[in-house]
Amino acid sequence: MSVEIFDLLKIAHEEGKRTRIFNTERLHAWVHVYPKTGDKDDMHCHNADQTFCVLEGECTMHFPDGGKAVLGPGMVATIQGGSFYQLENTGTIPMVLMGNRSGPQDAIKHINYETRKDIKHYFRDGPLRVTEETKEFFRQKKPD
């Protein structure tokens, strides 16, 4: 059995972005950094179950029905595959999360809420940040 030990906050502060720390056929894990207040991803879901644990900062999870949940350090969210959500840094410091998801990273889909399409290939180098440009891009990609 192989065991690796990681200093997640050190990785987060040195890399400053989403960094995979583990990837097998059964599970993958990563550290996710949202540096600025207001940084958020798109409303989306994945095709696998997952968890997020807040290590630093404040994370607000938004849901399609307008609901939300605020998580602080040490709090964990479990998300069933197919459940739509959006993560946002609503704190005053960088938001650092550790996430893990069942299955290998390459098998995971990132389904956008508006288009209902897998958009994983649009952001290979880190999480998709919601900007006016990305909003316009997805408005144009809506299915007929």
Where are these predicted regions, by residue range?
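A short beta-loop-beta micro-motif enriched in histidine and acidic residues
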Residues: 22-27, 37-53, 65
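Short acidic-glycine-tyrosine-enriched beta hairpin
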Residues: 65-81
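Ligand-binding loop in jelly-roll beta-barrel domains
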Residues: 73, 81-108
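A short, N-terminal "cap"/entry segment at the start of jelly-roll beta-barrel domains
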Residues: 1-31, 40-42, 112-144
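Short, conserved beta-strand element in jelly-roll/cupin
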Residues: 33-35, 45-61, 100-102
